[in-house]
Amino acid sequence: MKIGILCAIPKEIHFFELLPNSGQRVGGRTFFKSKHSFHELIIVECGIGKVNSAMVSTILIQEFKCEMLIFSGIAGGIDPDMEIGEVLIGEFLIQYDYGALKDGNIRVYRAGEIPMGIQKNKAEFVLDSVIKEKINTSLPDVRMGTILTGDVFLQCQETRKELYEKFGAQAVEMEGGAIAQIAEQFGIPAIVVRCLSDLAGANGHKLSSTSLKKAAKSSFETVQSILNALL
């Protein structure tokens, strides 16, 4: 299978093996070829945010003919029951900053729908059921849950609490929901793997270089296990 692997920042892509002289520049990004058993991989640092990740996802599908997308990276935890270093796979992905703003509150719609009137569909993009079963079988200890995506780096305890109360989500980040949206539009599956590097502003905790590196490595290792499960 040909799989596109996305990371947002250098520390996230650092652990992946990139074949020498395999880089190809498209749209201001360098796409590297690699292999994992029978899988052909296209690995790329997409950049931060929904626009970057959506653009690169489209290139992976259209230009490189990828049949699946996997994101590997870090996230901020918003579930009080989760701790730094825990890995989460996105079963549900919601773009929490997409919708209609009224009286200071945002009514979240499914990204891409006209944010007016009755919501036609649920806001979340859902992990493919067959892939979910394979991951659960091979990685029974890895948690699945809801990941929120927005174009904001969250370091605010009050907002963290509000997002958890509103969505019951486990983590917040800046790319996953957009990748899931693009993958769905092209009819291919997407898997978003995140390891908690910080707690999104809880108790004054700040993101450190050490926790970022450890989280990026844990996410990478989980992706390797997922690739094995997909053989």
Feature roles, as predicted:
Residues 66-70:
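Proline-aspartate-enriched helix->loop->beta-strand connector
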Residues 41-46, 146-148, 193:
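Active-site-proximal beta-strand elements of phosphoester/diester hydrolases
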